[in-house]
Amino acid sequence: MLEDKEILTMYHFEGKEDYAFNLIMRKYSDRLYRHIIKMVQNHDDADDILQNTFIKVWRYLPDFREDSKLFTWLYRIATNETLTFLKKESVKRFFMLSSAKITSTHQAYSDPFFNGDQIQFKLQKAIKRLPPKQRAVFNLKYFEDLKYEEIAEILGGTVGSLKASYHHAYTKIEQFLKEND
């Protein structure tokens, strides 16, 4: 796979916009999808958000000036699209979906033949309870293992505020896991 600089050179200077965009999609689709699904925990919603992300990338790629890394710019768009989606969700729909997922997962969890990882189940349940911004910070740091500087490029904000947000998320998850042990 080509380096980001080579892809961007193709896009901006060689007249190969479609080809370069296709390379970006192939290179980053899976990674962005994993980031989005961890926040929305629904396949169809994640697919829609990923599609909206790439629509915005297509629209704004001509203006991308490489002030940040391509992957952090893509993550910022994906994260913003995800946060917008989460905000737009009505309270009723959110609770209906959450209730249905928890009920079905809980039924599987209580099934003697269910061999899912109990810790993973509890962790996902705890993460889902976090406010969207804390959820984003936690997922980027814990699962994606990004540096705070990279997360700052993606989400905006200062490194200090992101560290505090991660600490609050970590504390809430830890408390949830202790209370639900």
Predicted regions, residues:
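A short pre-motif secondary-structure segment
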Residues: 137-141
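Short, Lys/Arg-enriched C-terminal cap helix and immediately downstream tail that follows
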Residues: 36, 87, 130, 135, ...
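C-terminal edge and immediately downstream basic/flexible tail or linker adjoining helix-turn-helix-like DNA-binding
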Residues: 11, 93-96, 100-101, 122-125, ...
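N-terminal module of bacterial RNA polymerase sigma factors
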Residues: 1-31, 38, 128, 179
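Structural recognition of an alpha-helix C-terminal capping motif at a helix-to-coil junction
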Residues: 34, 48-55, 68-80
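Sigma70-family region 2
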Residues: 13, 41, 54-69, 89
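Internal acidic/polar
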Residues: 2-5, 92-117
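Arg/Lys-rich amphipathic alpha helix in sigma70-family domain 2
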Residues: 63-65, 76-96, 168
